[in-house]
């Protein structure tokens, strides 16, 4: 259950953070209405709550592991929303990061 909860929260956090940053990007760089940026700020705030709901009690561990999710998620978002096509090095790098997420979050530790 912990792996499932952690995974779901990381996915929700990625959608909120990457989506929020993308909305701000659209307003600032692509000429969309400024209310897009406002929605982006709200989404970024929501991201913080998803991170705080992680079952692991250590902020540094959660945010370090989330960094790997952010990297892979950003490439995926770019593919879906902007037509970005990652090259093999992008994919290899993202895969390495996801392995790192697993090690950081789920490696057996003394004391449980």
UniProtKB/Swiss-Prot annotation:
<dbReference type="GO" id="GO:0005886">
    <property type="term" value="C:plasma membrane"/>
</dbReference>
<keyword id="KW-0812">Transmembrane</keyword>
<dbReference type="InterPro" id="IPR003844">
    <property type="entry name" value="UPF0060"/>
</dbReference>
<feature type="transmembrane region" description="Helical">
    <location>
        <begin position="8"/>
        <end position="28"/>
    </location>
</feature>
<keyword id="KW-1133">Transmembrane helix</keyword>
<feature type="transmembrane region" description="Helical">
    <location>
        <begin position="91"/>
        <end position="111"/>
    </location>
</feature>
<comment type="similarity">
    <text>Belongs to the UPF0060 family.</text>
</comment>
<feature type="transmembrane region" description="Helical">
    <location>
        <begin position="62"/>
        <end position="82"/>
    </location>
</feature>
<protein>
    <recommendedName>
        <fullName>UPF0060 membrane protein AAur_4166</fullName>
    </recommendedName>
</protein>
<feature type="transmembrane region" description="Helical">
    <location>
        <begin position="33"/>
        <end position="53"/>
    </location>
</feature>
<keyword id="KW-0472">Membrane</keyword>
<dbReference type="Pfam" id="PF02694">
    <property type="entry name" value="UPF0060"/>
</dbReference>
<keyword id="KW-1003">Cell membrane</keyword>
């Amino acid at each position: 259950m912990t792996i499932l909860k952690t995974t779901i929260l990381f996915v929700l956090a990625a959608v909120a953070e990457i989506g929020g940053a993308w909305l701000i990007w659209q307003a600032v760089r692509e000429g969309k209405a400024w209310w897009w940026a406002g929605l982006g700020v709200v989404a970024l705030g929501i991201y913080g709550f998803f991170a705080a709901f992680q079952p692991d009690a250590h902020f540094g561990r959660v945010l370090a592991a989330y960094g790997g999710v952010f990297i892979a998620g950003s490439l995926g978002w770019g593919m879906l929303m902007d037509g970005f096509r990652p090259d093999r090095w992008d994919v290899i790098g993202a895969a390495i990061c996801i392995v790192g997420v697993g090690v950081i979050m789920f490696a057996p530790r003394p004391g449980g």
